[in-house]
């Protein structure tokens, strides 16, 4: 995923 949503960036963590 190129674009990283604010809510998604926490998911990646």
Swiss-Prot record:
Job of this protein: Smooth muscle-contracting peptide.
Site positions (Cleavage): 10-12
Gene name for this UniProt entry: NTS
One GO location term (cellular component): extracellular region
Keywords, ordered alphabetically: Pyrrolidone carboxylic acid, Secreted, Vasoactive
Species whose genome carries this gene: Trichosurus vulpecula
Subunit comment: Interacts with NTSR1. Interacts with SORT1. Interacts with SORL1.
The protein, known as: Neurotensin
Protein family according to the UniProt entry: Belongs to the neurotensin family.
Modified residues annotated as Pyrrolidone carboxylic acid in this record: 1
Principal subcellular localisation of the protein: secreted
Any one of the GO BP annotations: blood vessel diameter maintenance
Compartment annotation: Secreted
